[in-house]
Amino acid sequence: MIIDGKKIATEILAKTRMRISTLGRTPVVLAITVAPNAATESYLKIKSARAHEAGMILAVARYPDSVTEEELIARIDSATEDAIIVQLPLPAALDAKRVLDAIPLKQDADVLGKLARDAFASGDANTCMPPVVGAVAHILTSASVDPRGMRAVVVGEGWLVGNPVASWLRARGATVTVANQESESMLPEMLADADVVVSGAGHARLITNDMVKEGAILIDAGTSESGGQLVGDMDPRCAEVASVFTPVPGGVGPIAVACLFANVAWLVLLKPSGVY
């Protein structure tokens, strides 16, 4: 089964638009970007289009690379928009973690600030899922897969993919092993018996079809560039042995963006309830 990420994303955005229609106003999402290049601008254009599909507006605040952390944090502190996202990566001179940690819980649709990450990790029902976790959840649901009791390997331990996905799978009853750079040489052995593999290493074609077992569920959340093309962590030939496979592009990416805007709806609709 090859997952059609665009189809799932379209369904999520349509449901989100329906939920938002009860508000009587159009939610606004602030996107902060520093020294955006052509690729960043292209990605922001896609996010803007998806925001429109979800019944929202994406307002982009562009800053030069001379901007300071204090200036970005001041913009976050004064933000009246419904949600705030910071387009990563930030220039190396800036402490991305400090900037992200300034985002209030009630506006953190990406779940990248400390307050939102801690709330998610604690299992707080009143917080939203990180978008990639939401994408993994939608993919498993679309394939009628319950991870409970399964052996899962998460490749990469970053806070965008690996850490939150591993946490979520454990909470769903899977036995989870995390592969990092130190264990890369042992990766074939780690993957050999895995029922589910979720990769977010950002290492082009790191995983080949001879490393995974027949019928494994393979979710590729890693992206990198190879030969001028966007590729995933998994060689496309992995689809030949997988029972479920997400291609790159067109798999996890579109679903994660849709989940981002579903999170905005979650935050906006929760605000009147006094949760925050």
Question: Model features per residue range: what roles?
Answer:
Residues 1-25:
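Positively charged, low-complexity intrinsically disordered leader regions
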Residues 26-35:
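Short beta-strand segments enriched in small/hydrophobic residues
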Residues 61-76, 183-190:
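Structural motif
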Residues 97-117, 219-274:
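Rossmann-fold NAD(P)-binding glycine/threonine-rich loop
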Residues 36-48, 127-217, 229-239:
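Glycine-rich phosphate/diphosphate-binding loop of Rossmann-like nucleotide-binding domains
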